[in-house]
Amino acid sequence: MAKREMMLLFGSFNPVHRGHTALAEYAIERGLCDEVAMIVSPQNPFKQNMALASEMDRYSMVELACKATRYPERIHASVVEFLLEKPSYTINTLRYLEENNGHQMRFSILMGSDLINTLPEWREAEAIIAGYDIYVYPRPDEELRYSTQRTTFLADAPQCDFSSTEVRHRLESGDDVSRMLDGEVIKYIRERGLWSIEGKIERLTALIEQGATAEHHIERGKCYYRLNEWGRAINDFRRAEALDAECVEAVQWRKMSEEILEYRYKDIYNP
C-alpha cells in the first residue's frame, strides 16, 4: 500500500494568517501532497525572546483557519511539537513523526526562502537535507541563496505582502485586519483579548520594569495616547526625554499630547 504524502508547514503562527493557509491550499492544488500538517511551534530556537501567545491559543487559531480553507479535510493543525522537549528542533519532530507514522506516511517540508537560507545552521541539518524533499516558496526581498538536490523552488506559489508581526501591530492599534485573517480567527482573538492595546501596555510595562529604554516609554505613551489617557501619555514621553535628551520623537509626541490636553480643558466660551 502506497504511503500518503504529508507536507509539513512549521510556524509560530502568532497569529496564523491568510498567507499561511493560501500556501497549504496551493500545495494541495498543485498535487505536491495528499495532506498538509500545519505544525504549531512552541518555541523557535532562533526566536527565543519572541513574545508568543499561548500554545493552545495559537493551536486553536490554526485549527479555525484550517477549517475555513477549501480543503478542511486535508489541511490540519498539529500539536506534535507541544509533546517534545523544548526548544523545538525540526529534526526531533521529524524523527518523532517517522517513529509514529512513518509506516503509513511520507513526509516533506514546506518553507520560505528566508528559512532555507539558514538551513545549514539548523541542528543536524545534514539529516534533514538527506532525508526529506523540501519545497521552497519565495519571500519578499529574500533571494534563494541555498538549495539541496532535493529542493524544489515554487516560483508560482502565492506571495503574501504582510507578516504575522504586521498583523499583531495592526491588532494592537485597532486597525482592520479582515484582509489578513479569517473571520473566525478574528473573532477568537477578540474574545480572548489577544494583541489588544491593553495587552501591549502590560507587556511594555513589564519590559520597563526590567530596565526602561526611551523606546519602551514612547511606545507605551502612544498606547495611552490612543486610549485618550493624555496624562499618562505625557508622563511616558517625558520619561523618554529624560532617558534620551536628543529623542525628537518623544518631544513631538509630548507637545502634541499637551496641546490636546490643554484644548480639552480650555473654556472655549471664556478664553
Please describe what each predicted stretch is.
Residues 206-209, 241-242:
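Conserved structural position within tetratricopeptide repeats
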Residues 197, 256-271:
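Alpha-helical linker/edge segments of TPR/alpha-solenoid repeat scaffolds
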Residues 1-200:
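Nucleotidyltransferase catalytic core that binds NTPs
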Residues 211-212, 245:
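Short coil turns that delineate tetratricopeptide repeat
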